[in-house]
Amino acid sequence: MIRKGAALAGLVLMSPVIAQPVMVESGRVHLRGQLVNGGCAVATESQNLRVLMGQYRTNAFTGPGSFAPVSVPFSLRLISCSAEVWRHVGIAFAGVTPAEDPHVFLASGEGIGNAGIGLALFDDQQRQIIPNTLPLHYTPILTSEMTLHFTARYRAISENMTPGRIHSEVWFTLVYP
């Protein structure tokens, strides 16, 4: 009986050595990235920028195409710029546009979708930036840090505007000509 117990204990202790892991191919992981040779990097504080647009009365708009009375300034800071890599940089803005006016970004209301208003962006010369297009103007890279200035302004896209909180999601990309 003792021999059986010793043999059984030996088998239990040896089983991890004898056991082989079973491997079954279950899938693959595809990892992709991109190496770029950009002339500038976006400063951390400009990567997820929030611009507070303020509060406006619906009667501040005189009809479709009319702008809010106030332009709200914002800036994007670029760092580690090198004119040895690229001589100019531009900013392209992308996002959803309303069917009523593809020259502005969609301003969505809480749970209502289109609020009857769009968001227009302008460069530092107050030229309107058309959404989802390449920049029309580029800035020379003269220093290692640059700040590009813009303004945002609401524009009526419908006779019917829905009061409430509104927001717009806009993405930007550095473009080198």
From Swiss-Prot:
Listed InterPro entries: Adhesion_dom_fimbrial, Adhesion_dom_fimbrial_sf, Adhesion_dom_sf, Bact_Fimbrial_Adh_Pro
Record GO biological process: cell adhesion involved in single-species biofilm formation
Pfam families assigned to the protein according to its UniProt record, in alphabetical order: Fimbrial
UniProt cross-references to Gene3D superfamilies, sorted A to Z: Fimbrial-type adhesion domain
Record-level GO cellular component terms: pilus
Disulphide bond pairs: C40-C81
Keywords: Disulfide bond, Fimbrium, Signal
Signal peptide annotation: 1-19
Cellular localisation: Fimbrium
Family according to the record: Belongs to the fimbrial protein family.
Name of this protein: Fimbrin-like protein FimI
Organism: Salmonella typhimurium (strain LT2 / SGSC1412 / ATCC 700720)
